[in-house]
Amino acid sequence: MTAGAQVIANSGHDDMIHDAVLDYYGRRLATCSSDRTIKIFEIEGESQRLVETLKGHDGAVWSVAWAHPKYGNILASAGYDGKVLIWREQAGSWQRIFDFALHKASVNIVSWSPHEAGCLLACASSDGNVSVLEFKDNSWEHNIFHAHGLGVNSVSWAPATTPGSIVSSNPGPGSTGNRRFVTGGSDNLLKIWTFDPATNGYKLEREPLAGHTDWVRDVAWSPTVLQKSYIASASQDKTVRIWTSDAANPGEWKCKVLNFDAAVWRVSWSLSGNVLAASSDNNKVTLWKENLKGEWENVKTIEE
């Protein structure tokens, strides 16, 4: 973590940094800022080196995301200008390989699917729409659809494997390459979307998950593929909700509420999916774990 902190401290950005993401191997860090640029750093132990500054957005850049390395050195960025830009590094040189500009308002976040599902990028916009870009056969295709009336703040993909299939002797069809994701909106709702091969588009899997009383700022689908699915949602209403679904009843979601003393902006799962980090308006990051009784406990608080 020290190297990451050093990079941010000496970022070279001229304005606020909105996102900082390490690549799959932890050797590169991409940052983005209100100064309209993206910066790429090489990380070597405790040291870091700025190797590239990418320019192309006409406003603040909110989000950056690395594709899985099986698809090459590909980075996506999204910003206030309503654009999603795809960048690729080849032979040490970064180039912009695709511009997506069909959103009519800020694109707030971009998220790559698990690589087993394909090279898919979900983009959430303040115009109320979600777009899914797919890179195949050396070209980009897209799906765009209306998701939340007051704007979409967040999107997170489900694991490619359904819960229970790893421990089941008969995982059944469709157990890998799952194309499902959850979105969170300014309508206070979460919605789960699934790919429908019949229409070649995405459809609402079930009724929206309701309970938050203010904007849903972030959603995070746990990468765990054991017996349950977990989705965490962070809200302006000073709560995090943890939604769980059992492999036996995949359409049924139960909810536990974690109360905070400030609005919660981001939630993030550990790689194993058993620890949840939440960051809130009071400059605190809290870590949560589920105990044997199924209750969520605050196991650590980090204050800056």
UniProtKB/Swiss-Prot annotation:
PROSITE patterns membership: WD_REPEATS_2, WD_REPEATS_REGION
Cellular compartments annotated: Cytoplasmic vesicle, COPII-coated vesicle membrane; Endoplasmic reticulum membrane; Nucleus, Nuclear pore complex
Extent of the WD repeats: 12-51, 56-97, 102-143, 147-203, 211-253, 259-298
GO MF: structural molecule activity
Pfam families, alphabetized: WD40
GO cellular component labels: COPII vesicle coat; endoplasmic reticulum membrane; GATOR2 complex; nuclear pore outer ring
Membrane topology, record value: Peripheral membrane protein
Keyword Transport tagged: yes
GO biological process, one term: positive regulation of TOR signaling
InterPro entries recorded: Sec13/Seh1_fam, WD40/YVTN_repeat-like_dom_sf, WD40_repeat_dom_sf, WD40_rpt
Domain of life: Eukaryota
Keyword field: Cytoplasmic vesicle, Endoplasmic reticulum, ER-Golgi transport, Membrane, mRNA transport, Nuclear pore complex, Nucleus, Protein transport, Repeat, Translocation, Transport, WD repeat
The family this protein is said to belong to: Belongs to the WD repeat SEC13 family.
Quaternary assembly: The COPII coat is composed of at least 5 proteins: the sec23/24 complex, the sec13/31 complex, and the protein vtr-7/sar1. Component of the nuclear pore complex (NPC). NPC constitutes the exclusive means of nucleocytoplasmic transport. NPCs allow the passive diffusion of ions and small molecules and the active, nuclear transport receptor-mediated bidirectional transport of macromolecules such as proteins, RNAs, ribonucleoparticles (RNPs), and ribosomal subunits across the nuclear envelope. Due to its 8-fold rotational symmetry, all subunits are present with 8 copies or multiples thereof.
Function of the molecule: Component of the coat protein complex II (COPII) which promotes the formation of transport vesicles from the endoplasmic reticulum (ER). The coat has two main functions, the physical deformation of the endoplasmic reticulum membrane into vesicles and the selection of cargo molecules. It also functions as a component of the nuclear pore complex (NPC). NPC components, collectively referred to as nucleoporins (NUPs), can play the role of both NPC structural components and of docking or interaction partners for transiently associated nuclear transport factors.
Name of the protein this chain belongs to: Protein transport protein sec13
Record organism: Neurospora crassa (strain ATCC 24698 / 74-OR23-1A / CBS 708.71 / DSM 1257 / FGSC 987)
